[in-house]
Amino acid sequence: IRLDSLSNQTAMANVSRIEDPMARALVWTAACDAARDAETSSSDFIELVFAHLETETESTTIQTILRQLVTNGNLYIPIGTRPQALERIADGLIDLVTKAKAGSDSQLQFVKFLPIFARSASQQQWMQDLLSGKIQLAGFTVDQDVRWELTTGLVMNGVFGESEIAAELARDNTANGQRFAAGARAAI
């Protein structure tokens, strides 16, 4: 859908106040489409997400928005400002993780998407601390899949290497663990 200028401004400023989940999803879709089609800037879309995603209640909508952030951050942000945009997204996800309802699906989704964006030393340290248990999130268990996702994210950024992959594989020497280890090794 396309919104006229006034409707777009009103909807984007108030997306988190829209009560009907379907209407909210349509507004989010319009925002994603506008960023994709360069009708609004990708950085504006990122700011919209972090101004309103915290209150989104629909798990599928959250996942769709996070996937759009991946596309937006990796394809639509100009290369010259991409590192800053990816750091902004990671910082926003860390903030959302800490504010999310304990044990919620949104909390899990924010953690799972974080390794895709985390670039700075502080973001890498946050992931290491979550992986090691130094950071404890209420209601959140760092299960084996999350361990692999964090490990792979740390490998992608050169923080972890073969020894950490081997240690994780020793912990999870299953078919799934073998698949995750292959993915982590491919990220070296």
Regions from the language model: what does each represent?
Residues 1-188:
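Long, ordered, helix-rich scaffold segments
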